[in-house]
Structures are given as C-alpha cells and as structure tokens.
Amino acid sequence: MKLIRQLAAAVMFTALVIPVSATAQTDVDALRKQFNGIIEDLNDNSFERFNRAISKKDMTARIYGASVIEPEVKSAFSKEFSSSIQGLFTASFPKSKKEILGTVVDFRFKGNEGRAVVRYVSSGYRYSYHVYELGLDSKRRIQIADWIDYYRSSRFSEKVAQDLAMAMPGKQATRNLLRRQSYNEGQIFQVGELFKAVRDNQPERFFQIFDGLDEVLLKEPLLLRINLQFAMAFPQSPRAGNAVRLLVESFPNEALYSLQMTEYYIQTGQFQEAIEALTTLEAGLGIRDGAIGSLKSSAALAMGRTEDAVAYALQATVAEPTLQVSWWSLLRARTRAEDYSGATEALARLEDDFGHSMDPATLRRDRFLRVLASNPVYQDWRASRQ
C-alpha cells in the first residue's frame, strides 16, 4: 500500500510539474515572438513599435541620473524624446551602402526580466551587437529598459547622458562625466574644451587638445573611447594605432571595446589580434555567434591557417545553421584546404537552403572558388544534381 501511495504521489507530481514547465517555455516563446516583431519592424524601416516598447520613465531616469545636464538641454530632450531616441539609435550604426538589418540571435526571460542579443549587419560584413535589457508591463508587453551597444562601446542611456552633458559642458557636468573626481581646475578646463570639440565635431581641435592632456587624464575610459572613435576615421595612421594601444593598456580584454578593436585590426592586417578580440566579444555577449565565427575563419585564411579557418567555419555553421555567411565561410575554407568533398556539403546547403546556383560559371567568378570548377569531385557532384 505504501508503494502504491508513493507511485500515486509521483504521478501527481509529474502531472503538476510538466504542464508548468511547458507553459513557462510557451510564455518565453510568445515573448520572443513579440520581440522578434519589434526588430522586424525596424528592418521594415518602422521605428514606432521599438519606440513604444522603450520604457520612457525608466530610460529618462537612467539618462538624467547618469550625469549633470543643464535644465534647458534636459527640457529640450524631454519634449522631443521619441524623435531624439530614434535619431540617436540610427546614428549609432556604422555607415552602410545597404539597408542595415537586425537578427535576434539570443533571447532569455525569467520572471519579469529578460535579455536579448540582436546582431545588426551593415555592408562590407560590418556588424553591430546590442544586448537589450527587457521587462514587462502590466499587460505582459515587452518593455526595453536599456541596451549595451558594442559598436559604440557604451550603454545607450550613458551615451545619451554624455551627449546631453557635452551640449553645455559646464565645470560640474564635465567633472561628473569623469571616473575620478579629484582633478584640479586646469584639468577640468582641458576636458571641457575637449568636450566642446566633440560637440562641434571638430576632430582636428579634439586631437590638438587631447595631445596636450595631462598624463593622469589618459586613464579616463570616456576620453579614450572618444579618442578611438575620432582616430578610427584614419585607421592607417599612427594616431589610430596609439588610440588602440592606450585602450588595450588601460582596459585589457574588455569586451565592450572588442568590436571596434576588431575593425581596426582587420583594416590594418593584424588578423591574430582580430581573432583574439572576436573571442573576447563572444565571451562578453555570452553566446556562440555564426557571424563572429565566419569573421574568425576569414582572419585565419588571411594568415594561411586553413585548419583553423575550417574549424572556425564549422563552429559558425553549428552555432547558426540558418546563417548563409557561415556556409560561404565553410565553402571557402574547405576549398582552400583542398577538402573538395567537404566543400560540396557547403555547396549543397547554399543551393538547397539559400537558393544559389553553384554552377561552374558562378564559381569561376569567385577568385577563391574558381579552382573548384575544374575539379573532378565538384564535377561529379554537379552531375549528380542534374
């Protein structure tokens, strides 16, 4: 009888627990679908749902609490909150010759708090990653509290607060933007003039002042970040290299700066450093990302490390089997490694899943793939698909 009661209790426990777990997952799936819809609207050039999802009360509290902002600046921003947020959001991306599109690559929710990672892609395989802090309103609609922008190396609310403070950089506002509060009046004046150059978008004036800053100020993360952003307009210059050096020395292995570091390293042919920065970025995001794996594969190929290139490309296809660039990376890596049988796997996925025609004429137009066109393994594969 005791055994029967135990079995009955176990059955009752299972009956109670499984539906709750299933319901919780169903709820997360519904929330993800809701958030996907917000990003899809952005992709369709509509900012309305994204703007509605932002918790204005929480966002303004974060912005106004992060810095000393002059009352007239604060008033003007509050009156134009929605349009200001939209302008600042769209200005945060790298320049692109084509439409910038976002993809939700990670979504998690527990209770009333969640987190989503969105990858935005620009032309030239340039990426931006946002990590959104999410909540729910009383009707269980997604609310966006804030986000970390890895391309701009900052939290959105903090960046807005800094921009607003720099609009009228008085002594207290200037001091408040710095991590250390014990600078003397002369040093605060230097930084205030620097912020005016940022506000007026005067890079030459900015560099002139930055080069004369007291040594102690060159540990301030905000100043180093702005210096890198201005210097990246001239990536081949010694100034850009020095800006990167200052950041790396002051904040080694800091994920927040890793994406901008990656761009610099790729543009200057420092491919091993690019791979290391991308690894730091993935660790910061807390995910395996197909686009990052593809970039690692390309960097490894540029160094002639075909085995590593194949490994990174495979990681990309496992992380995101529906991401087209992952399969292109695997195709190029296996072709370079002369693994032609393996290359046909990627060819098949590109044809079957993404609608490409991988015929000989197509391959010959690609300098990395033209060797395949006359290869017997490829020709047998091509014949088998006729």
Q: Language-model features: where?
A:
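A conserved position within tetratricopeptide repeats
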Residues: 211-215, 245-249, 282-283, 317-318, ...
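Short, low-complexity N-terminal intrinsically disordered segments enriched in polar/charged residues
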Residues: 22-46, 175-190
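Generic helix N-cap/helix-start motif at coil->alpha-helix transitions
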Residues: 29-31, 111-113, 124-126, 182-191, ...
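Long, contiguous interaction/recruitment modules in multidomain scaffold/adaptor proteins
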Residues: 68-195, 199-217, 238-241, 246
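TPR-repeat structural position
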Residues: 203-204, 237-238, 271, 306, ...
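Terminal, low-structured helical/coil segments at or just beyond the last alpha-helical repeat
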Residues: 356-386
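Alpha-helical adaptor scaffolds
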Residues: 225-233, 245, 255-272, 276-319, ...
